[in-house]
């Protein structure tokens, strides 16, 4: 998995991480999600969601049949869980300590994840988040 993380680190932008986590949340019931659901969740256009889902598929983090359901691969699920475990504490700490605007905190937390993605295991450990679950629904005003 470490090799995969290093290969993907250069390609996982803050936006890709956001889509990965949103897709994971939508797929949590085990039924998968549609691009239109991801678009609605993130308040983006359907073409934008489709393009980013295709990007996640090309990285081996998701699968999608034409006009079908999006599902995360086991690697995608693992990466999404790791990102979620880091995202929420980063967001909460910045929001509490710096009193920044919520949207700015979201953006900065995603940028931190993207910049330190190669070392995300260390980041998760340092944030002491191994057994803490933070629902994405609270992070995004949906």
Outline where the language-model segments fall:
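N-terminal helix-turn-helix DNA-binding core of bacterial DNA-binding proteins
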Residues: 3-44
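Key DNA-contact positions within bacterial/archaeal DNA-binding proteins
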Residues: 47
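Short, hydrophobic-biased segments on the C-terminal half of alpha helices
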Residues: 53-54
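A short, conserved structural fragment
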Residues: 57-67
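Basic, amphipathic "hinge/linker" alpha-helix immediately C-terminal to the N-terminal HTH DNA-binding motif
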Residues: 68-86
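Alpha-helical linker/hinge and terminal dimerization helices associated
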Residues: 83-97, 101, 119
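C-terminal regulatory/oligomerization modules of transcriptional regulators
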Residues: 107-142
